Amino acid sequence: MLSIIIPLYNAELHVPSLIKNIKELDFSNIEVILVNDGSCDSTEALVTDFINSFNSVNLKFINKRNGGVSSARNVGLQNINPKSLYLTFFDCDDWFYSEVLNSFLVEIQSLPDPDLVLFNYVRNFGVISERIDHKLNGVFSLSENFVMLYTSGLIQPCWNKVYKTSLIKENHLRFEEGISMGEDFRFNISFLEVSKNVAAFSSSLYQYNSDSANSLTKRFLPDSFEYFKYGISKVNELCHLKGIDYPDIHNRYITALKDRFRNLALSTLSYKEKNILFYEDFSFVRNNLDKIKTGSLSPQDRIIYMFVRLNLPKFIWLAFSFHRLIKFESYK
């Protein structure tokens, strides 16, 4: 059985399309667990009506006090079917491809018992969309392709992955509660620490709606740089544990600085306040320049590196502002 856990919070606008999506699933080998995280709108009423009319033992609806997405997912994990072999986590404002899920348990039988299954996905920007393709197929060890998967942003989210249920149960893995961002990434790193192999399917499992108001690309995140630093340290630990060769991991500090600027642009802070925050992060990168491998930096990042080394934060600010050197790297 494949289990799908979907948290809901004030999701009345998304419930109709979610219901349509769920109806396309084959409930003979799939269960869906909807967790209402203390919604204040009509989410509960809409889902209750659907549950009563659909009448399937493999469609569960759980109400709980508001505690955040991690709390809701953890409640879902506590209520999965004992027969569950694999599970995944979706968001209610996105879209999943039911035909891929319906055939998953059949297709997985042709592979040698993977711990984690990685899919491609589609990123929807409203008017246009982009297919994110890992260009992999089959089973491989984590050390083979981890760096590519991490730097391309495919490791970070949960919704492009299917996890072996037994590994989560045996290792008592849960989402960290009480944090404002990065809960997917932290869970994935913990899962990868106990995983042996990964399978990649060439099909797209999921459509992530970047145009959603809840998308991290639309919100100012005060702790975004700290999250990036934490992520780099955790990846470094994972690489040591798994014997993954990633000598230029600290080059990601440049990426973190670029991302910080892009996120500051979303804030309502004054120009002075933005400069203060940016300079704090700039100073951290400058103090860690000795860890950066300049030979593997892109031409764009070498310019940023040069400004950091010369202690010219205002030049970076101007470069970001007027030449648009950065490309925001989303991690929902």
Role assignments for model-derived ranges:
Residues 205-211, 218-247, 259-289:
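Catalytic core of nucleotide-sugar-dependent glycosyltransferases
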Residues 10-24:
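Short, well-formed alpha-helical segments that are part of the catalytic scaffolds
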Residues 36-46, 66-67:
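A conserved acidic beta->alpha catalytic loop
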Residues 92-201, 206-225:
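Donor-binding/catalytic cores of nucleotide-activated saccharide
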Residues 267-332:
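Membrane-interface aromatic/basic loop that binds lipid-linked glycans or pyrophosphate carriers
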Residues 64-82:
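Glycine-rich, basic loop-to-helix element that forms the pyrophosphate-binding segment
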Residues 14-16, 41-50, 75, 99:
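Acidic helix N-cap motif at the loop->helix transition within catalytic regions
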Residues 83-95:
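Short beta-strand-to-loop acidic/aromatic patch adjacent to the donor-nucleotide binding site
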